[in-house]
Amino acid sequence: MYSRPSNYAPSKDVYGGEMRSQPAYSYYPEEEIQHFYRWSSPPGIIKIMSILIVVMCVGIFACVASTLPWDLDITGQSMGYGMGSGSYSGGYTGYGFGGSQMGLGFAYGGNYTDPRAAKGFILAMAAFCFIIGLVIFVMLVTRTPLSTSRKFYLIVIIVSAIIGGLVFIATIVYTVGVNPVAQASGSAFYTQIVSICNQFYSPVQTGVFVNQYLYHYCVVEPQEAIAIVLGFLIVVAFAIIIFFAVKTRKKINQYGKTNILWKKNHIYEDGDPQVEQWVKNVAENSAPALSDYNEKVDGSVADYRSANGVQAYPSQNNISHPIAEEELPLKEDYGMSPRHYSSSSDATTKKAPPKKRPGKPRRSDLDTNEGGYNTGGESADELEDDSWDSEYPPITQTKQRQEYKQEFASDLHEYKRLQAELDELSKIPVPSLNRELGQSSRKDSEEYRTVADKYNRLKEIKSSADYRNKKKRCKGLKTKLNHIKQMVSNYDK
């Protein structure tokens, strides 16, 4: 049956509002730090895209330049070959061809695109893209003050948008220029161009001379198709650069420059080097620093201690008189003689502190109360840290380090699972149940009995051996993980 605790202090009245417990790993300061030196970060992706743009520009140069000899009369002579006796005239503006003269000439008029002009346009844009991509990459790698500012990424956005649009236009013009059938489609000269180029779209008879210049004019060669594809890929790369440049500016505004790391060597100047790197190798995400499990439930510490059968506050006798000296026997497994500590040396001159859990004194308290005499008994957690030294000694070789990493990964998974189960119990509003029981006017009502059942059931769970074992196991895993992490950190120094 429900019995209301005598020393009850509702958290809302004491603290001015409900205090909810934080779940495991509810806040990590490292998550607020943006690691912009990584290749997977927004600036890193911009660097990758700039490298790809430089490579694709070189590819466009090679592909387009390989077709230029067919558009240039280097020797000053005609580059045509006879295709038979007699002569033929296409009959459309600016185009003439003579078979009996062994000559060939082109003149473009109207709305037709000169292949030489289209190739010159795309070569010029490829040169601009090459320079811009190289400049962006160099500035991001050197990490100049300008390249770490919002103004730089604004310039990148504007320049990428302009150059990307021009490259898109140049690629379209080049596609039309190297494919005369496509640009003549729908015009009055489509029939004439098709009749001239149709001979190259069907199998050529043996022994028939082929005009190579006309062949390269009518047929889109493989290197020309590759240049077209590379042109569109450059446009896509500039679009990706614009997207991540906008994202970088937003992160700079959101987190501030003080929370952004542009160089890797600034991360662990005051800490352990390479610890975060090996933790990520054994877990999905970077393992945050392990912290003590928050033992208070949804309310004050008094609520939790009352629910576990521990007196919430010291009695009047304990307040008016010094706290009795406690002797904490240690386990024989550690091979140490039992020692004790005294918490009553200054009790007559100072207000008695709240009653602490046995076996877990703070070292700072010992230093203060004992006047620097710190040879008293160690806490249970300190003894537990010492016990891991024998099972996990300092690392001396790489193979041993890898074994420690694997052990860390398996134990970390179990620790998170147990922590999640404990957090589920912490979400149950114990203070609100107490308030409902205290405010209920009729103890025989159905609502009162329901709330009382919930309270008693929660109290039984928290006082059960299974719950205590989970808490003990969770704390043991935390100590073990901290020890393994420290050993690897010492080895990596």
Swiss-Prot record:
Keywords, alphabetical: Cell junction, Cell membrane, Coiled coil, Disulfide bond, Membrane, Phosphoprotein, Tight junction, Transmembrane, Transmembrane helix
Intervals, Cytoplasmic compartment: 1-47, 142-151, 247-493
Any single Gene Ontology cellular-component annotation: bicellular tight junction
Cell compartments where the protein resides: Cell membrane; Cell junction, Tight junction
Segments on the Extracellular face: 71-116, 177-224
The record's account of how the chain is modified after translation: Phosphorylated.
TM region(s), chain numbering: 48-70, 117-141, 152-176, 225-246
Sequence positions bearing Phosphoserine: 379
Region called Disordered, residue ranges: 334-407
Segments forming domain MARVEL: 41-250
Protein's membrane topology: Multi-pass membrane protein
Bridged cysteine pairs (disulfide): 197-218
Main location: membrane
Tissue expr: Localized at tight junctions of both epithelial and endothelial cells.
Residues with the Phosphothreonine modification: 375
Function: Probably plays a role in the formation and regulation of the tight junction (TJ) paracellular permeability barrier.
Family statement drawn from the similarity comment of this UniProt entry: Belongs to the ELL/occludin family.
Domain remarks in the Swiss-Prot or TrEMBL record: The C-terminus is cytoplasmic and is important for interaction with ZO-1. Necessary for the tight junction localization. Involved in the regulation of the permeability barrier function of the tight junction.
Protein name: Occludin
Organism: Xenopus laevis (African clawed frog)
Lineage: Eukaryota, Metazoa, Chordata, Craniata, Vertebrata
Designated gene of the protein: ocln
